[in-house]
Amino acid sequence: MERGKMAEAESLETAAEHERILREIESTDTACIGPTLRSVYDGEEHGRFMEKLETRIRNHDREIEKMCNFHYQGFVDSITELLKVRGEAQKLKNQVTDTNRKLQHEGKELVIAMEELKQCRLQQRNISATVDKLMLCLPVLEMYSKLRDQMKTKRHYPALKTLEHLEHTYLPQVSHYRFCKVMVDNIPKLREEIKDVSMSDLKDFLESIRKHSDKIGETAMKQAQQQRNLDNIVLQQPRIGSKRKSKKDAYIIFDTEIESTSPKSEQDSGILDVEDEEDDEEVPGAQDLVDFSPVYRCLHIYSVLGARETFENYYRKQRRKQARLVLQPPSNMHETLDGYRKYFNQIVGFFVVEDHILHTTQGLVNRAYIDELWEMALSKTIAALRTHSSYCSDPNLVLDLKNLIVLFADTLQVYGFPVNQLFDMLLEIRDQYSETLLKKWAGIFRNILDSDNYSPIPVTSEEMYKKVVGQFPFQDIELEKQPFPKKFPFSEFVPKVYNQIKEFIYACLKFSEDLHLSSTEVDDMIRKSTNLLLTRTLSNSLQNVIKRKNIGLTELVQIIINTTHLEKSCKYLEEFITNITNVLPETVHTTKLYGTTTFKDARHAAEEEIYTNLNQKIDQFLQLADYDWMTGDLGNKASDYLVDLIAFLRSTFAVFTHLPGKVAQTACMSACKHLATSLMQLLLEAEVRQLTLGALQQFNLDVRECEQFARSGPVPGFQEDTLQLAFIDLRQLLDLFIQWDWSTYLADYGQPNCKYLRVNPVTALTLLEKMKDTSRKNNMFAQFRKNERDKQKLIDTVAKQLRGLISSHHS
């Protein structure tokens, strides 16, 4: 029962659920009915629900039928009216179709026109859009075209600026266009191209200034020369408030605008063409010859590109290489002045360019870099000049070189480079210049001395007399009073040598100009060089003349006279140096001239040569002596050779009238002593083993002839018998043997007042031995044999006593 109740309860619940589902189906949209139906299929009462659903459908059909039946008449009427309307509608449709056909026919052209208008409007919109886009693109294209034009005309820095504007201002506005992407891709390439082209221009510039450095330097040195000439003119004229040209005035200010489109700023040649200037026009500035725009452009371009340091390093490296090339002198530079000039021009040109770069760029080169280059250049230049100047043997070339070095130093000093070392080196070259002058003047003196006739200068008129006196400081009142023609005591080489000494002093003075030396230094330099000229060059030249083999006594006498007058002229040379240097001789540390010593030495050498020459002549005459030492005949006159010798000596000493008295007296005494010594040697020589009393008698006649010559006073100034003393040894020896006064000799030997004081026992013994041998072999007088034996015994006795004197003397 309970089970029945439970089934009934379940049936009621199912029925209620089905009712709910049906209401949902009726009230729910068809699209959302799926979940409701799923709940039916999920349950177990599917059949009942279908039955319930059929029941509900039948109920609704009945209600619909009832409703239709209630409204049927109205429906029929409506259908009737609808049928009527359909006919009218058909008519209306036909009319509309006909109207449409007519309208289509009539509006076909309009439609075509409208279609054309539509296309036109579309084109207008497209054109307008295109114009707008082109207005955005046109500046880009214009800038790109401008960039290309600038690249084509080599305006690289403006091109780089244009490229910057193009990249950062214009291209971002139209970056979605394909051509812009192409441009963007080309920008790095263009930058590299600009960079490469500007570097190429820089290389061309560097190569150009390397080739034209000598022209730049030549112009700069001409400017410096003009300025120096102008300063010299100003210094010679009264001036008020004048100022020396400053370093700033040496520069030509370059107003080079890098972005300028002027032809000059866009030229890539480092050197501008300069027309030949007229002589009276100003020499163009060194920088006027150079267009530095390639350097400025390249510097700015690399700065903009962030590679300034790379550019600076490259520029300095290349210029260092060029400096080494410039500083390498040609091997034949020393041969001509043009070689030195070209070398200096290149160095000056190099540093003029670098100095201008230093003052017109910000940091491309700095003072430390310039100083480093200059130190290197200075050391190499000085080394090259020392080497090549040492080859110079022409003093004129050395002097021209000195002037060129001074101009070189002055030019670089204007640009602020220290040049003290160059002037120090010039002091070294000064010594070399002095040596070349000494060599040149050695040739001049040699020519003068070789061409001189060594005869007093004859003058036949007042003009000739004044001409000689004007060339050489000579005063002689007695000579002035003499009538013409008359003669100066000296020969022509005296005024010539004196004037050449003055010319040498002038040549030394020329070198000291522009060396910034004080008057005392110049005076000291001239005096030292002149002393070298006198003590070495002129002295050697005089000594060479004096020592010549073919020099005659007349020439030697004239040389002594000439050197005497040159010695007197030394004070005038002192005055001459004082006048040109304005340094008084009394100044402390002033070097004195050694001319007096030089001429004294030369005169003494000439005197010695006279003595030697005289002795040689005497020896030549003595070689003609032909004594018969075994003769028994007694002669009555002197030997012929001796007579000729005495005649030669008389004529020779007659020439000595112009010599100083002591010189003539010394020469005469020397000749007599040498003659006496030679005669003594002739008498005692070993080859003469035997001699007779007759030979001694002849020898005695020759000695008497010599004594007669000495007594005649061939040279004035000797006291009585002074000259005869030269023959006193011979006289006493001959008297001893001829008078055979051995008892007196042996008795008085060693006493101060001995009659034969000058006879040496050795000499007497030697001569006695020669006579003893003769006595032994002489058999001519047999009837006097006892007398001969007595004489022989006497000779032996005397010889024995002489040996005793000799041995006692030695002991």
From Swiss-Prot:
Taxonomy, superkingdom: Eukaryota
GO biological process: exocytosis; Golgi to plasma membrane transport; intracellular protein transport; membrane fission; mitotic cytokinesis; vesicle docking involved in exocytosis; vesicle tethering involved in exocytosis
Region (Disordered): 260-280
Gene Ontology terms: cellular component: exocyst
InterPro entries for this protein: EXOC6/Sec15, EXOC6/Sec15_C, EXOC6/Sec15_C_dom1, EXOC6_Sec15_N, EXOC6PINT-1/Sec15/Tip20_C_dom2
Parts forming coiled coils: 50-119
Keyword annotations: Coiled coil, Disease variant, Dwarfism, Exocytosis, Protein transport, Transport
Illness association: Spondyloepimetaphyseal dysplasia with joint laxity, 3: An autosomal recessive bone disease characterized by multiple joint dislocations at birth, severe joint laxity, scoliosis, gracile metacarpals and metatarsals, delayed bone age and poorly ossified carpal and tarsal bones.
Stated family: Belongs to the SEC15 family.
Its biological purpose: Component of the exocyst complex involved in the docking of exocytic vesicles with fusion sites on the plasma membrane.
Subunit structure: The exocyst complex is composed of SEC3, SEC5, SEC6, SEC8, SEC10, SEC15, EXO70 and EXO84.
Protein name, per record: Exocyst complex component 6B
